[in-house]
Amino acid sequence: LYNFGDLEGVNFFNNLTQTVAVVDAINNATTYNKYTILSGDRPDILSFKFYGTVDYYWTFFLVNPHIRESGWPIPTYDLLDETKGKYPYRTIVTNDDISKNFPVGQTVTSNNGTTGTVIRKIPEMGQLIVDNGEEINTTAFGPINQTVGYTDTVENTPITATILAESAQYNSIHHYENSDKEYVDLTLFDFNNPAASLTPITYRERLELKNEELKE
């Protein structure tokens, strides 16, 4: 607790002398020991393991920019649930041009009667991200070669797209990579036939790869 200037009352404030002492020790260190974070490791647990106190948990964020920017890695046993919660919708892939149709917020219905709301569309991948109202969307919008669509209320005309692929969002393709791990664009309106040299990376795989990087 500290008094600041002539202000009445006291305020909670971190003990900066403790922080400065640790920062100086880190800055004066000539070497660092590498450690791979294991499932179940927490900052306070590792602080106690290395320093004999839980007080220095924040040093891991200080000296590891990737953790500071992206957060502590998720335990492996929690990762799938985290992925489903982060990407809970359905992904529909179509070769039809959706750039001007299927606006975000539009209600759409497939041949099998499943209805949902367009949350996002990615025309360069031919993808519609649709929320069917379930907490974790498990009800599919139908098999391939069926259609999903809506009625344009201005023109009073039906707008449809043929389903090439449909899956849970977390299992759908986030991007394609070449052999150098670089993102590669697909040929427009031929989204189901990527070059054989390209590797598809799903939302789930991307999160798992990112999580592994945070452990180092």
Please provide the spans of the model-predicted regions:
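Cell-surface/extracellular proteins and modules involved
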Residues: 1-216
